[in-house]
């Protein structure tokens, strides 16, 4: 069985978490046999997988990046990210347990890490690339967490924070799993909000999104031409040059907005919802191991 995980040109905490988490929970479980594909963390339930390949779904979500996949006998579901995913796929809502990143609770002791930061901010990885959020955080007096850092460094910085403000969905998901209060920054593109609501639905959680402006001229320009692919590519391709020409100028209004958001109380799903979701995932993890140990034994 091969593990499938999205990997772009730049590392991204939510996607890299797959490689970190599953090698700890399922050591020696995966190989390069693509006849069976393991789908874990992420909005990776696409419609373009080989229809003859067996897809094993373990906490993934539907993100709307393709049409919904046609579910047939080659799809096996242990659980999915949320109620919307279950609805779109036409499977029983009882499969909606939560994002499998919650299983980080089984591999990481956040309580053993000393709290050092009153508030930390984690942008979306594209915002980290094109924006100047490290400078915004410096001016706002808020600790900066880069989603492109190695997984364990991000986990350490989240654990060392009293509160996390995050534009990155897995910044909030993992903060919630580790019981670190968080606030969510509203995604600029409305289409990116559905996956947040999907995750929250499994935990009976209402997300109180905060809007925030662009950090610099690159992000402001990209926001204005978001629907024009040609112009958007031109701006993002030249982002370093634009920042150089503008002296890496950041918008003071965004600094103030981030400070205001940081002063608000953090959110958390209920302890009961989190413990229940985690325990159900552990049961499914045991079932997965049993199911495939039996199949391996039958082949031998």
Swiss-Prot record:
Protein's pathway: Exopolysaccharide biosynthesis
Listed EC numbers: 2.5.1.98
Keywords associated with the record: Exopolysaccharide synthesis, Pyruvate, Transferase
Keyword Transferase belongs to the record: yes
Reported phenotype of the disruption mutant: Mutants form aberrant non-nitrogen-fixing nodules on peas.
InterPro entries in UniProt: Polysacch_pyruvyl_Trfase (IPR007345)
Catalytic activity entry: [4)-beta-D-GlcA-(1->4)-2-O-Ac-beta-D-GlcA-(1->4)-beta-D-Glc-(1->4)-[3-O-(CH3CH(OH)CH2C(O))-(R)-4,6-CH3(COO(-))C-beta-D-Gal-(1->3)-beta-D-Glc-(1->4)-beta-D-Glc-(1->4)-beta-D-Glc-(1->6)]-2-O-Ac-alpha-DGlc-(1->](n) + n phosphoenolpyruvate = [4)-beta-D-GlcA-(1->4)-2-O-Ac-beta-D-GlcA-(1->4)-beta-D-Glc-(1->4)-[3-O-(CH3CH(OH)CH2C(O))-(R)-4,6-CH3(COO(-))C-beta-D-Gal-(1->3)-(S)-4,6-CH3(COO(-))C-beta-D-Glc-(1->4)-beta-D-Glc-(1->4)-beta-D-Glc-(1->6)]-2-O-Ac-alpha-DGlc-(1->](n) + n phosphate
Alphabetized GO MF terms: transferase activity
Pfam families on file: PS_pyruv_trans (PF04230)
One of the GO biological process terms: polysaccharide biosynthetic process
Origin superkingdom: Bacteria
Family: Belongs to the polysaccharide pyruvyl transferase family.
Function: Catalyzes the pyruvylation of subterminal glucose in the exopolysaccharide (EPS) repeating unit.
Designated name of the protein: Exopolysaccharide glucosyl ketal-pyruvate-transferase
Organism from which the protein derives: Rhizobium leguminosarum bv. viciae
Lineage: Bacteria, Pseudomonadati, Pseudomonadota, Alphaproteobacteria, Hyphomicrobiales
Gene designation: pssM
